[in-house]
Amino acid sequence: MDAATPGNGGIISDVVFVIEGTANLGPYFESLRKHYLLPAIEYFNGGPPAETDFGGDYGGTQYSLVVFNTVDCAPESYVQCHAPTSSAYEFVQWLDSIRFMGGGGESCSLIAEGLSTALQLFDDFKKMREQIGQTHKVCILICNSPPYLLPAVESTTYSGYTTENLVQKIGERGIHFSVISPRKLPALRTLFEKAMPVGLIEPQPKDYSQDPRHMILVRGMVLPVGGATSVPGVIPPKQPISQPPLPVVPPQIANAPSHQLPPVQPPYMQVPQQNTLTTAHAAAQSAVEAAKNQKNNLPNRFPLPNLNQMPPTSAVGTPFNQPPPPAMPQNTSVPKMVTSTASLMTPASQPSLVTTVTTGPGPAPVQLQQQGAQQQPVPPSMPITGAAGGVQAPQPSQPQIGTAQLPCTQTPVNGNKLLAWSGVLEWQEKPRSVSVDNNAKLTRSLPCQVYVNPGENLKTDQWPQKLIMQLIPQQLLTTLGPLFRNSRMVQFHFTNKDLESLKGLYRIMGSGFQAGCVHFPHTTPCEVRVLMLLYSSKKKIFMGLIPNDQSGFVNGIRQVITNHKQVQMQKIDQQRNMGAGQAVGTGNVPANTQAFLQKQPGALPVAQAVPQQMQGQQVAPGMPSISQVTMMDEQQRTQNLLHIRVQQPQQAASQAPPQATQTTVQAPGQPQNPQPGAMLRPQNPGANPQLRNLLLSQQPPQTSVPQTQQPLHHMQQAAQGMLPHQAMGQQMQHQAPGQQQLQLPGQTLMHQAPAQQWGNQMQQRAPIPGTLMMSAGPRGPVPQQGLQQVQAQSVMEDDILMDLI
């Protein structure tokens, strides 16, 4: 195993998975994926794959997938290749999309075709990484059959090479070759041995197989040691697990060999990343022995691991979040390892603020000295609270967050990183106090440093001393993902001079925001105009992405945020309109109408049509709801109502003479048979001025309606879905109280006396032939001035857009 190639120890990796895509591997692939492939991806990714983790195409780990088949796949190509990606989440989706087909009649597979394509990918990686330099190259072969004794034919560069020639070529180029197979095939072991890098003396390989039938030959990465009972997919070994002085070692500790321990540091100091594997192996042995001692001793006895086998531990504590305090041995300077499958598998979606409990060879902090007198046992499953801080913490699925531990330390900057800039980062957040105004903003700032990889040319001499950051909501990250491509990646590190601001930064970046837009003012003569600060909840680091295409990125993020604001404003307008509609419906409907609605929830009167639609009831089956009726400007609506009230006596006088032969007027006490499909109406429609307003707007053209009702035509336009034509069987001619209704040839009119009871209206009336006429008026879209004005005033400029513009 190459000790100089830890997963996230600052070395950028190029990883190619070469997988047999035949039915011979299909039944075993899920087990291999679960036990080996996902842990390997987490090893290179620095944590479980997350959809919001983005890395630059030229600055992070690159993954590529090659799927090869057998000779019976003709006329299809022997190999399918996926272009490189820097997203581990996307790569896992590629793995899940493989269709294992064919190969049932073949005893071999076209491994030579797959390896030749993989070598071509590494050639492409070399061109892509010219600015970065040397990278850590890994090729992983996953198959269940030996290779054909045939040379590669589909590759242009490596055509004619046999499988053995290709693996030798892989070793000569310094590519670490690994083999994962569900069976122990001698031919595959021979390929692994021939692919040994030139001049490298390998130690005895470890047994990483989780099943005795599997053959796992690994080079250039670290997997969980074989025989573990833990569920795969735990935190990869490159993330150091902090060691609190807990007396409890759960039985599931056997999975701990997959975790490294960082070297010792004084309390509350930065923790450098572990670059050797011997420490992890020693920690694994001590953890297993501690688990055995836990089973052999009494429940109230707390065994200590052998100090000769225990590696030095860091001052970073494991996060805890619930009482009671742990029982502490008096020798608090002796650390103990506590890991469990449950805690390791806890999702990392919680805020990254942790209460720290530190131990080490040096003097113990005050918190531990205060707890030293307590010797009571604590069950293994019980969460524990640190003595100081009082800050709630997530489960230990976020082990590497030194900075957030009361935040006094932070995830370290790798030793091979170079300091590029040092200054202050400033941002605004909403105060946590409930009594503070919602529009109030709290300005915070923190000293920070920007680190780059060796060899990267980042001109920061013209950068301002203070950088202003605007927070980006978490829901926009997936939309902004494509904009993060083709970017240079830097690492931000914050000092702990202002603990309150550091807490606030981790709180907001770990809960509702996971990104910030750092804008460089135009007054500074630097080439960078915008920088995206991302927080990786898995890696517990702040990454800065500097887009190579600055103008394109600015335009893209401006468009994304503008669209997001428009969607938010539309939701706010809809909620406001629904609230206004409910207020109108409950405040202006007569009491007798409301009482009827309570008794007859299935029947909907005309007078209730507009407000009740806002409450989810429909006028008739299939009719769409209309929120436009309630979206008029309040002042314009009041003026229209007053205007119509003045004109009503004139309407009554003008409509009295044309009463003729077919007028159907009903006395107060007489029953009336309503037409099938006709809408019900309240006893006194005139008691509601807004509904009377709507009814008057529906007068047929033959009744001389004054032209002063024209301002309400746009209201009628919006209500067309509520007042359908004859095709829907709805006949709704309405008249104001006190007016005789006129039935002209080809029309059906109804009139109801104010004193008539609702029960009589439920009877049926014979249908009257004729056509239904609607009031004349403009049918095109009529602008709603009041609504447009409200929308124009309600769209506010976002802080990020202001800075970007």
From Swiss-Prot:
<feature type="region of interest" description="Disordered">
    <location>
        <begin position="647"/>
        <end position="691"/>
    </location>
</feature>
<feature type="region of interest" description="Disordered">
    <location>
        <begin position="308"/>
        <end position="332"/>
    </location>
</feature>
<dbReference type="InterPro" id="IPR021394">
    <property type="entry name" value="Med25_PTOV"/>
</dbReference>
<dbReference type="InterPro" id="IPR038196">
    <property type="entry name" value="Med25_PTOV_sf"/>
</dbReference>
<keyword id="KW-0010">Activator</keyword>
<keyword id="KW-0805">Transcription regulation</keyword>
<dbReference type="InterPro" id="IPR021419">
    <property type="entry name" value="Mediator_Med25_VWA"/>
</dbReference>
<dbReference type="Pfam" id="PF11265">
    <property type="entry name" value="Med25_VWA"/>
</dbReference>
<protein>
    <recommendedName>
        <fullName>Mediator of RNA polymerase II transcription subunit 25</fullName>
    </recommendedName>
</protein>
<feature type="short sequence motif" description="LXXLL motif">
    <location>
        <begin position="691"/>
        <end position="695"/>
    </location>
</feature>
<dbReference type="InterPro" id="IPR002035">
    <property type="entry name" value="VWF_A"/>
</dbReference>
<dbReference type="InterPro" id="IPR021397">
    <property type="entry name" value="Mediator_Med25_SD1"/>
</dbReference>
<comment type="subunit">
    <text>Component of the Mediator complex.</text>
</comment>
<feature type="compositionally biased region" description="Low complexity">
    <location>
        <begin position="647"/>
        <end position="678"/>
    </location>
</feature>
<comment type="function">
    <text>Component of the Mediator complex, a coactivator involved in the regulated transcription of nearly all RNA polymerase II-dependent genes. Mediator functions as a bridge to convey information from gene-specific regulatory proteins to the basal RNA polymerase II transcription machinery. Mediator is recruited to promoters by direct interactions with regulatory proteins and serves as a scaffold for the assembly of a functional preinitiation complex with RNA polymerase II and the general transcription factors.</text>
</comment>
<dbReference type="Pfam" id="PF11232">
    <property type="entry name" value="Med25"/>
</dbReference>
<dbReference type="Pfam" id="PF11235">
    <property type="entry name" value="Med25_SD1"/>
</dbReference>
<dbReference type="InterPro" id="IPR036465">
    <property type="entry name" value="vWFA_dom_sf"/>
</dbReference>
<keyword id="KW-0804">Transcription</keyword>
<dbReference type="GO" id="GO:0005634">
    <property type="term" value="C:nucleus"/>
</dbReference>
<keyword id="KW-0539">Nucleus</keyword>
<comment type="similarity">
    <text>Belongs to the Mediator complex subunit 25 family.</text>
</comment>
